[in-house]
Regions:
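Extended, charged catalytic domains and RNA/DNA-binding interfaces, predominantly
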Residues: 2-177
Length: 177
């Protein structure tokens, strides 16, 4: 019976009977006004001329991660899907971050999702002036390994890439399996 249930479920997934994957969305195609970016920079420089403090988030999930997807379901009082474009807009316009990293769970990232994430990261970085970006978005994923003891439990690790060029990033994220 387990095989029959699994076969029916797998067929349903293949035929898209359980819904469709949300698209990555399109971030608002504008950077912060340059006067705001300049004011922020000058405020930091007036405090300490030798160092610059940057604020960022290195652990951001969208609804491409299974846990974030489940918590976003309206049946659980969630708001619905939050694609990567929402994360970009939140980082830029709400959280006023200097940088952030997209770190959806590797084991949930299909080739289609990974391709969408890479395109969305590039779109998120586009509105800003290349020489003076208002926000830097890094491509990444979360590698998770769960063991049954402290000796073989490695937990969650965020993998980040400095480049977003297609020929400089992996073809797929590598999960722990």
């Amino acid at each position: 019976t387990a095989f029959i249930i699994f076969s029916i479920y797998t067929t349903g997934v293949y035929l898209d009977l359980y819904g469709e994957l949300e698209e990555p969305g399109i971030p608002i195609n504008s950077a912060l006004p340059s006067s705001l970016v300049e004011d922020k920079f000058l405020a930091q420089k007036s405090f300490n001329k030798e160092k610059q403090i940057l604020f960022g988030d290195t652990h951001v999930h969208t609804t491409y991660s299974t846990d974030a997807f489940l918590w976003s379901l309206p049946i659980l009082n969630g708001e619905g899907p939050h694609p990567i474009s929402d994360a970009c807009d939140f980082a830029r316009f709400c959280a006023n971050l200097d940088f952030w990293v997209s770190t959806d769970h590797a084991e949930a990232l299909t080739p289609r999702k990974w391709k969408s994430i890479k395109e969305a990261i590039r779109n998120c970085n586009n509105p800003a002036d290349e020489n003076e970006p208002d926000l830097v978005t890094f491509l990444g994923y979360e590698w998770t390994q769960v063991g049954d003891s402290a000796q073989n439990h490695y937990g969650h690790k965020n993998v980040m890439f400095l480049d977003i060029d297609e020929n400089k990033v992996p073809k797929r994220p590598i999960g722990a399996g």
